[in-house]
Amino acid sequence: MEEEMSNRRVSNRTRKVATKMAAALTSNDNRTQAAIARLEALENDNGAIEVIDLNDDEEASLDEDDDLGYLQKKQHKGSKRKTRQAKALEARKAPKSFLELLQEANLESLPSHVPTYLKAAVGPPSSSSRRYFCSVCGYIAGYNCCLCGMRFCSIRCQNIHKDTRCQKFVA
């Protein structure tokens, strides 16, 4: 890997960015909007969790001591049996987002002494400086992108960031 990087030719030509583009990239509003958009995309990706029905396997739920278990599993006349299609539709139901779960929890109805997600206390601010992490690998980052402001830790992560993650065209 090191040999590939040393054999690579490096350009001395500087990049010219349009003044409007540079102004848009340096504004904190655009950077916060891009960060919020990335967080929403992550939340949407995490929302597609597959639900597994534990009561799906009837044979696994039978007692091993009961030899006549398969005879006692007859359907009652009043109950409806779920079809495969109904089970598949139930499994495909869209999972709820975090905000929807918070609204359903009805946290306002709880007594005031009960700690909730919204009432959780934050400790005093740290006396040490803030730590920044690499947007590619998660290690401690010492550098940041001059175009979009995201952080990276090494040349390898910088190259990956430039190829795939740089938000220079968001504005």
UniProtKB/Swiss-Prot annotation:
Zn(2+) 2 binds at C145, C148, H161, C166. One of its GO terms (molecular function) is zinc ion binding. It comes from the Eukaryota. CDD domains: zf-HIT_ZNHIT1_like (cd21437). It is found in: Nucleus speckle; Nucleus. Keywords: Developmental protein, Differentiation, Flowering, Metal-binding, Nucleus, Zinc, Zinc-finger. Residues 63-87 are annotated as: Disordered. Disruption phenotype: Early flowering, leaf serration, production of extra petals and weak apical dominance. GO terms for biological process: cell differentiation; chromatin remodeling; defense response to bacterium; flower development; regulation of developmental growth; regulation of flower development. One of its GO terms (cellular component) is nuclear speck. Expressed in root, lateral root primordia, shoot apex, leaves, stems, inflorescences, flowers, axillary buds, developing siliques and premature seeds. Belongs to the ZNHIT1 family. Component of the SWR1 complex which mediates the ATP-dependent exchange of histone H2A for the H2A variant H2A.F/Z leading to transcriptional regulation of selected genes (e.g. FLC) by chromatin remodeling. Coodinates SWR1-C, FRI-C (FLC transcription activator complex), histone methyltransferase and general transcription factors. Represses flowering by positively regulating FLC and MAF4. Binds to the promoter region of FLC chromatin. This is SWR1 complex subunit 6. It comes from Arabidopsis thaliana. The lineage of its organism: Eukaryota, Viridiplantae, Streptophyta, Embryophyta, Tracheophyta. The gene is SWC6.
